[in-house]
Curated annotation (Swiss-Prot):
Subcellular location field: Cytoplasm
Subunit text: Homodimer.
Recorded catalytic activity of this chain's protein: tRNA(Pro) + L-proline + ATP = L-prolyl-tRNA(Pro) + AMP + diphosphate
Gene symbol of the encoding locus: proS
Organism per entry: Elusimicrobium minutum (strain Pei191)
Function: Catalyzes the attachment of proline to tRNA(Pro) in a two-step reaction: proline is first activated by ATP to form Pro-AMP and then transferred to the acceptor end of tRNA(Pro). As ProRS can inadvertently accommodate and process non-cognate amino acids such as alanine and cysteine, to avoid such errors it has two additional distinct editing activities against alanine. One activity is designated as 'pretransfer' editing and involves the tRNA(Pro)-independent hydrolysis of activated Ala-AMP.
EC numbers: 6.1.1.15
GO biological process, one term: prolyl-tRNA aminoacylation
Notes on the domains: Consists of three domains: the N-terminal catalytic domain, the editing domain and the C-terminal anticodon-binding domain.
Record-level GO cellular component terms: cytosol
Name under which the protein is recorded: Proline--tRNA ligase
InterPro entries documented for this protein: aa-tRNA-synt_IIb, aa-tRNA-synth_II, aa-tRNA-synth_II/BPL/LPL, Anticodon-bd, Anticodon-bd_dom_sf, Pro-tRNA-ligase_IIa, Pro-tRNA-synth_IIa_bac-type, Pro-tRNA-Synthase_IIa_type1
Pfam families the record matches: HGTP_anticodon (PF03129), tRNA-synt_2b (PF00587), tRNA_edit (PF04073)
Keywords tagged on the record: Aminoacyl-tRNA synthetase, ATP-binding, Cytoplasm, Ligase, Nucleotide-binding, Protein biosynthesis
Amino acid sequence: MKLTQYYLPTLKEAPKDADTISAKLMLRAGLIRKTASGIYEWLPLGLKVLKKVEQIVREEMDAAGAHEVWLPLIQPKELWEESGRWTYYGKELLRIKDRKGAEFCFAPTAEEVITDVVRRDVTSYKQLPVALYQFASKFRDEIRPRFGVMRAREFYMKDAYSFHATEESINEWYLKFFEAYKKVCTRCGFKFKAVEADTGAIGGNFSHEFMVLADTGENEIADCDCGYAANTEKAEIFKPKFPAAKEELKTIEKVNTPNATTIEDVAKMLGQTADRFIKLLVFTADGQPVVALMRGDHELNEHKLKALLKAQELEKANEETYAKVTGSFVGYAGPVGLKEKNPKIKLFADYHVAGIVNGIAGGNEKDVHIINVTPSRDFTPDVYADLKIASEGDLCGKCGKKFNFTRGIEVGHTFKLGTKYSQSMKAEFLDENQKSHPFLMGCYGIGISRIVAAAIEQSHDENGIIWPAPLAPFDIYLVSIDTDINPKVKEETDSIYNQLTQAGLNVLLDDRNERPGIKFKDADLIGLPHRIVISSRTVETGEYEYKQRTSKEAIRRKLADISEQIKEFQASK
């Protein structure tokens, strides 16, 4: 492809609202343009990469035994009401009405419609298992779209679903998709890790995320030498053992803390550290208030609390609910005496709260805190559990060794859904005894557009993108210099271009009438694996200049040996 005939608008500077490396480079390199908040156009160069990812994923899905379908983006309210998600999916679900007033949504996922497809046609265990997949644009009305195409409102993904009669069957197919995703990540040239994950809005009872490792990743991964790995939303922490208290238990005492509503403010006022505090948080779980207690320097993991409560929805309580539950103000509520005021309320405490001796808590009145608070003596939680987000120093819940922490970008997610959707939607089959059962289901999503961004986050330098060879939109960036003053340059360039393309290599020929510096900058920005330069200086010596994108220096090679170079290119694809 000649650049003079190709639509490739590059930019010297990234737009100011581009907030990640991948967003900046995708915009500058002409892969995408922004239409609206969280919505992007994919230009020819970006689309070539997207289609390469799509083909890799398609090949692995086919190899796993799944079959491709095409499902509607616009889905009727009635299907989502059957699953219950019309109500609890929340504002991220974009809802619309047609001219007759019928309600629909722009699908962020496809569990409902695929379950409807299968329940209409699959009635017997003899027809199982079934595995179907699709590539489709999805829409999720993110409250704050960010990170370019990684957290966009409109995105492109592959989602697959499997239906089974037995637990053995779903386990077998879950492993098939798990291995297929590992192959996808390997073929894309990624350094990656598969980690245990929370099931989130999809639901189910078991899931893994496939993380592309990158320092700029939005997800933190807790990783142990024993082989256990999970994102910090899911990571199980070893239950701490607390030695007998060395300090003498002191009598609780109220202290004035005027206008000090944060742990930081009170700690400074009292000359204490955050780990001495008992933090009280109020939530509503499926509409019912609950109280969580954390050590002051720890962050509550809402996913763990939600799972513990087996709640569909968990939200932070508003000020009115907070006051009703605690009888106090935000920043001043504490566990001491709370059960006496509100006997029906349940206290859920993280394990680490049990280790606090002579701690500090809210005094349940304005501008007052209580010091010398000790759990079990001054209050008793209903439940102790692992409720914290894993952080530096925490021990692995499987073996007790210290976690290592890395960052990653989620590109794929696999779920064992069980009967979450089939039961609520009455999707059933008959077994060999003519007894009816809900399908056991699996769900397997992979973000095609996210993979493109993740590749850039993992592989780039100060000059631009460094594409892994399997994802590169072209194999070679061929640069011609001095064609206007030296006919020999054009002759040799055309010859090499023809030889490369006839060998099945994809070549982008920069034949623009631009300065060499501009061409070289664009070559680095676009990030193709190989660069060849033909100029007056090289043809004089019967040579061409060759540079790998990952190398700092270019080397000279003989034009007569181009056939050997072609073999190297073919081997590296």
